[in-house]
C-alpha cells in the first residue's frame, strides 16, 4: 500500500516513515511541501493515504488538502494531518477542508497506528 508523507522537516518525515515501516508500510513516498506533494500524488494516483503537515512553504497542508479534494481522482483518499496546530478552530478548519483525521505533534507511534486504522477502516 502506497502512502505519501508531506512535511517540510526532514526529521519529521524520517520519524513518520520509520513509524510506518515498523507498522508494515514500506511503500512510502515523501515530499517537502504541498507543491512537491501534488506532483508526486499526480504521478502516483494509486496512493492510498496522504499524511501531511499544515505549515509548509510553497503550498501549505490546508491548501494541499483543498487541491486534493477538488480532484475527482482523490476525493476519497484518506488524509491525516499531523501538525502543531492543535486548537479547536484549527481542527475544525482542517476537517471542513477534507481532512479525515488529525494528529497534534508531538505524537506517539501508537497514535499514528490508531489514526491509520481508523481512516483505513481496519480498526477493531
Swiss-Prot record:
Record annotation: effect of changing residue 122 to A: In strain: NCTC 11637 and NCTC 11638
Keywords: Chemotaxis, Cytoplasm, Flagellar rotation, Magnesium, Metal-binding, Phosphoprotein, Two-component regulatory system
Assembly, per entry: Interacts (when phosphorylated) with FliM.
Name of protein: Chemotaxis protein CheY1
Organism from which the protein derives: Helicobacter pylori (strain ATCC 700392 / 26695)
Sequence ranges assigned to domain Response regulatory in this UniProt record: 2-120
SUPFAM superfamilies documented for this protein: CheY-like
Residues where 4-aspartylphosphate is found: 53
Chief place where the protein resides: cytoplasm
PROSITE patterns to which the protein is assigned, alphabetical: RESPONSE_REGULATORY
GO cellular component: cytoplasm
Cofactor: Mg(2+)
